[in-house]
Amino acid sequence: MKKKALIITGRLAQDHEFIYPFYRLKEENYEVFTAVKEKKIVLGYFGTKIPPQKDDKIISTDDISEKDFDLLILPGGVKAMEHIRLDKKVIECIKEFDKKNKTIGAICSATMLLISADIVKNRKVSGYYAWKDDINNAGGIFTDQP
C-alpha cells in the first residue's frame, strides 16, 4: 500500500516550494494529495498551476484529516500563508500531525503555520530569516540549518 502525503497550499504559494516536494514525493512512490481551500487548481506566485495537472489529487482544506496521511508538507509563500493560517481546520490538522509524531515539513514562510498551531515551543525551527523573532517569541529556537 502506498504511503500518502498531504501538501497544504493556496493561491500565491511559492511555486518551487510546492513543485519540488510534490514531484520528489511522487518519485518516492507516495500518493500525493494537494489541499487547497477552494478544491481547485490555483496559481503560485510565479504562475505555476498548483497542482500541475487536472488529474492530480486535490481536496479542500475543509476535508483534511491527519488520520488519512503519513506526512505533511507546508510550502511557503507569504501571501498564501497569510490566508492559510486563518483556516482553523488547517491549524487543527497541523496540531494532530504533531500529536501523532508524524513528519511535518514546513518550508520558508510556512513556519507561520507552525507558530499558529502553537507547536514550536522548545523546538529548533528553521525558516525564512524574517520569522526569527516570531519563532523565538513563540518559544521556538530559530536555526538557519535545514
Predicted stretch roles:
Residues 3-41, 53-146:
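Active-site-adjacent pocket-lining segments in enzyme domains
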Residues 44-52:
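Acidic/histidine-rich helix-loop elements
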